[in-house]
Amino acid sequence: MRRVIAHTIAIFLLTAGVSVSAAQQPAPEGLSRPASAAEVAASLAGSVAWIWPDSNGPLHQGKAAGPPYREAAVLVESLVLRAGRVERGGRTQPLALPAGVRVVPVVHVEAAADAPDSFTPAQRSAILAAVRRHAGRAAAGLLQLDFEAPPRQREAYRALVAAAREALPAGVRLSVTVLAHWCTQGDWLDQLNVDEVVPMLYRLGPHAEDWRRRFERGDSRLARRCRGPALGFATNDPPSRMLLARAARPYWFDEAAWSNPSRPAGHLIP
């Protein structure tokens, strides 16, 4: 019996060693290279472009047929939460979209340093009113809440997401953007009542490559919802070809407003 157990343990350890070794193997050289401009454009043609208020969206490149992107995640309203009040902003210029491009309205929320840990009733009502107001523009059947809530507002954020889900009509799904490190903070993201979680894999700081490798291989320590089909990338800092291939539903951000600005870029919070 002891021999059987010892043999079984040996096989398990050997198998585990092979698995760990395989997980730690670097990607083949061709797949580890950053995606080229042509590969980014090809991905964008079948995916989603984030369009912020200072942009008119991606332009056609060359003689490509069809629209340069499939869906436009357009920031339609922004709300800055401050101590006891809400500041509203949003798009001030008209947006002309190519024929056939469907809109995903994005409600963007920011918390200033003096914002309370728990939202005031007026702040909560303002966010939910924006969600209801723009749900009718969701031609893609999806509305996105873009809110990088600080840790002190985590519980308020979870309650807000649940309320936003309730505020949407039955035919409109809810998407949320998340910071990459949120995906390593337990399973709280898996418990959100949302239809889509979009980890933003750009502006990752000095450990950017480590983060991207974790998403490349679908690290089991990442929250399950962070290993879904949607991933957020930036055109100026493209992912590896392997990571791009993993994203069945890429979202693309462009630091230069797609070189098609509608007004000077500006930040909501100085």
Roles of regions detected by a PLM:
Residues 8-17:
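Bacterial N-terminal signal peptides
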Residues 1-9:
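Bacterial N-terminal signal peptides that target proteins for export
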Residues 2, 18-270:
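Secreted glycan hydrolases and related glycan-binding modules that recognize and/or cleave
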